[in-house]
């Protein structure tokens, strides 16, 4: 009896084996230390600086303005300040000025608000990667979380504050999980590629939101039928704020939920049986199947958990600062797509995703028109710079996949190894 052939290892000669893009990327991300992502970010910013220079502006001044616009310079403003102790009337000494009238403090608040959903959408992509799946559907899962979150948040107005918040967040997370599980189920049962199905689900989620909150839609605002927007969520469904003016997008407790997501991501993958099975399937699904692990079950669970992270991000944004959802919000949002760059730059690890999310959060806030001096860098170029750096990160991280594809396809285009010429007659063998 011959043993079933298992899939070749990911670092094997690719001449006879070409793993999926997702599995190859996941393997690449696990290999090596922190040097590669750091170099990826540095090179991306250097090339961005070349573009800035080509427009006639000073790259150093531009990046300095972006850094200050992100509010991260707040940590350098050390002095003698005080901070209010919650639930008391006392103040204690603190290193930094927490008054959000201070420009750096306000900008930092905006950076952290942007970082919060990026952490969760980054985890949504990273968790699927660890199972060898490429979750392009973080955007659709995020949108489903926002749709369900705004619906629950604007209803059940008689509920107490904490139960209402927990109920809305739970429903938003479950909506994202269901949306992700659909792609996982199709992958597990009929072999439908998750990239195709998640892209399709992104569009379905977008048009569901556009219909529900559009003109004469079933969930359009009851008091203003001229505006394609949802009802505002109830006051008792809003997340508690930690820092800043609640009417000016104050920092809310969602940042702690996102950090909790990072911890949960690490514990699930490294301290549970489920995590072991997910990683085993990600390394080699055939070997995992031979070892008694249900590959189909893990495909579904991995995509469901990925969707849960993204749906939770949508619920947090709605309950934390957005408070309503319009057709324009649905159609222009790209938080889920940025999560792909966050996961790749963070090498699909909890710490890496957290740091990458902070980097992109600061970049997006720092390049916003409210943060940049037009004389330093024109607003019309600022947003494009942020998009270009995201694209460069994806390009550099995925470059090895291109090399692998060319290498494994060289025979098809006539570039394979040439057979050795036959030995002359009478030659020694």
Which sequence ranges carry the predicted segments?
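Short loop segments and helix-boundary regions at transmembrane helix junctions
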Residues: 25-35, 55, 128-138, 159-233, ...
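Hydrophobic core segments of alpha-helical transmembrane domains in multi-pass membrane transport
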Residues: 36-53, 118-125, 146, 150-152, ...
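Cytosolic-side transmembrane-helix boundaries in multi-pass membrane proteins
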Residues: 1-43, 49-60, 283, 290-298, ...
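Single transmembrane alpha-helix segments in multi-pass membrane proteins
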Residues: 50-57, 61, 65, 72-156, ...
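Helix-loop-helix "hairpin" substructures at the membrane interface of multi-pass membrane proteins
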Residues: 178, 246-325, 350-351, 355, ...
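Cytoplasmic juxtamembrane regions at transmembrane-helix boundaries
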Residues: 126-146, 269, 274-277, 372-376, ...
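Transmembrane alpha-helical segments in multi-pass inner-membrane proteins
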Residues: 307-310, 316-391
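Transmembrane helix-bundle core of multi-pass membrane transporters
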Residues: 69-72, 78-85, 198, 202-271, ...
